[in-house]
């Protein structure tokens, strides 16, 4: 708070959605990718906060009656159930806005040359996050998802949808982490992009698997939600065993993309393992 007025109920809804648990995979990917190429900086912290805030906003809006109409998220009432629909919409709007406020905030950099370099990095990070979360990324994926209800998709169409809806923000997290450091080269960025493409899709495949194999008490949301909403999933297209094979293939692709990094990318490897082994 910068001393201005704010609406307490709106702030409460924002905190409820941003701080009420979750896996924090996206900010962890920011830090892990930064450590893979160099050291974390103040911009790394800003990027981690920003991607999680965008993710929280997207969940609020996804859960709304006009979208997925869910009443349970992370084992708790969804934002529009806990508060009301209008407050939930505004909380999502505000969380999206504050993400870019954090990402573009002035950095405390001691050396002038770093200050100049990091201003350019901030602008690049803002552009990446905006593109990945907007009409060419996450929002596009959600639009395709809504249009796919009661439709039959090919595996290629389903993959494209989730590359946008889920993978775009995961890819942005990894790019922002690497760019937030003092030293990263184009070869490293290209390898991290391949890792991001594979692990972003693997995340969604595992989500589809958990949707049919994990009980609500562990999953934190209603089991079989996508099937109930008549949405195509990797399990519905490939079967459970086929979806598990798909997740393992994507995991191997992600780990292979990190071959040239050595031990500095161990956190990214660990996160890849977690993503396909998780139970919620």
Predicted regions and their residues:
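Short cytosolic juxtamembrane segments of multi-pass membrane proteins
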Residues: 278-280
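Mg2+-dependent prenyl diphosphate-binding active-site environment of isoprenoid biosynthetic enzymes
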Residues: 4-258, 264-276
């Amino acid at each position: 708070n910068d001393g201005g007025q704010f609406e307490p109920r709106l702030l409460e809804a924002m905190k409820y959605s941003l701080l009420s648990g979750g896996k924090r995979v996206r900010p962890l990917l920011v830090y892990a990718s930064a450590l893979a190429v160099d050291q974390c900086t103040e911009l790394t912290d800003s990027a981690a906060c920003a991607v999680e805030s965008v993710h929280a906003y997207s969940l609020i809006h996804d859960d709304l009656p006009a979208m997925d109409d869910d009443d349970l998220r992370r084992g708790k009432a969804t934002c529009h159930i806990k508060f009301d629909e209008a407050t939930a919409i505004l909380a999502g709007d505000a969380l999206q806005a504050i993400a870019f406020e954090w990402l573009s905030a002035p950095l405390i950099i001691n050396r002038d040359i770093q200050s100049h370099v990091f201003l350019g990095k901030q602008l690049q990070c803002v552009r990446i996050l905006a593109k990945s979360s907007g009409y060419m990324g996450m929002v596009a994926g959600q639009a395709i998802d809504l249009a796919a209800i009661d439709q039959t998709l090919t595996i290629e169409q389903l993959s494209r949808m989730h590359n946008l809806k889920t993978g775009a923000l995961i890819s942005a997290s990894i790019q922002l982490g690497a760019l937030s450091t003092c030293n990263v080269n184009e070869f490293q960025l290209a390898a991290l992009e391949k890792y991001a493409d594979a692990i972003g899709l693997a995340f969604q495949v595992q989500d589809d698997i958990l949707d049919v194999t994990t009980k609500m008490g562990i999953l934190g949301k209603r089991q079989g939600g996508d099937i109930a909403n008549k949405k195509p999933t990797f399990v519905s297209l490939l079967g459970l065993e086929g979806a598990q094979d798909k997740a393992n293939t994507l995991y191997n692709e992600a780990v292979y993309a990190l071959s040239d990094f050595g031990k500095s990318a161990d956190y990214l490897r660990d996160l890849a393992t977690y993503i396909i082994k998780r139970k919620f």
